[in-house]
Amino acid sequence: AFGTEVDLPSVHVEGIRHIGALDITYADELGYAIKLLGIARRAEDGIEQRVHPCMVPKGAAIAAADGVYNAVVAQGDFADKVNFVGRGAGGGPTASAVAADLIDIARGNRVPVFGVPAGKLLKAAPRPIERRFGAYYLRLMVIDKPGVIADVAAALRDHQVSLESVLQRLRAPGDNVPVVLTTHETQEANMTAAVAQIAALEAVVEAPRVIRIEQF
């Protein structure tokens, strides 16, 4: 998309293994859908490339891509946002793609994978995930006792992370209870440091779950 070489080792990749049913439920309550996205952005300090689960607003076109449908969102300097949605799996779409490749081979059409010959691709510095600036969803499982939320908020404050919302379900005193927080936009490095401090709290009984929130 940017006429640059793809530096595969620098692509940040996460799967969906850490996503649980609770996260899907809370995402819905918060007005989001969870999608596994591949994201590439060009910034002044390099090319950002990452693949991981995201929360996206339920009203976004990309949130409606379910089942065999895939979606691509492209944003340009003058065209603003352009959405492409279509079937990406199933007998018909797969057969069509294979047939198109066979026809290109038969005709001798050589279309570069990235739109231009590999020798003409430019080199660009990768932009590390630590520089991402955005909002976050954080789910904790904690012992329900006084002061826990204050300790969590203090850890976030220590790393310049501002809270946007907090959800907590009532349980019997002493039981473990899920606590869900969303943050305002902050840098990934700050969020990572805050989560590490929160995970070390005695009242936190499971590894914190973090999902990035993307606006499309």
Model feature map: region roles:
Residues 97, 102-216:
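A conserved regulatory-domain signal marking ACT and ACT-like small-molecule sensing domains
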Residues 2-7, 75-82, 132-133:
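Short acidic (Asp/Glu) and glycine-rich catalytic loops that position anionic groups and cofactors
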